[in-house]
Amino acid sequence: MPFDLDHALRYLIASEGSDLHLKIPSPPLVRLHGKLETIPGTEPLSPEDTIGAVQEMLHDPNKLAEFEAENEVDFSYSMEGLARFRVNAFFQRGTVSVVMRAIPVNIKSVEELNLPSVISRLAEEERGIILLTGTTGSGLSLIHI
């Protein structure tokens, strides 16, 4: 059965996973609560599967040239009404691998993220800068004030 990128991304979002990993010869993997898990019913990926996934998503000729020259490229990919994804495609051990980070359409509020209420008040100030820092996967890209 050929690899279905659309199915894998829909599974990622439905399962509330954070990342999709495409690496030969593993089946597609999703990161759920910090652990990598196989997407049920999928088979190990072939070189044609990972190359096909990149070709399906990457339509910018400049980015494609960058990928061919540098053996790595970062870009974004969107599925309307579902989510946006930050994509890193790279060569690993002579084959193409892909990691995609989901960026949900619905952004959580300060309250939903259990941040101190002072954050909302500080955001209303006319001058200054507020830095919110954290580790990868801690939800910082989801903050909307």
Question: Where in this protein do the model-derived segments appear?
Answer:
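Short, conserved phosphate-binding/catalytic loop or strand-edge motifs used
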Residues: V30
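ATP-binding Walker
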Residues: S138
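N-terminal accessory targeting/assembly segments
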Residues: M1-P27, L45-D49, L58-N62
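P-loop NTP-binding catalytic core
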Residues: H33, E37-T42, E48-I51, Q55-T133, ...
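Conserved small/polar residues in nucleotide/adenosyl-binding loops
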Residues: I143-I145
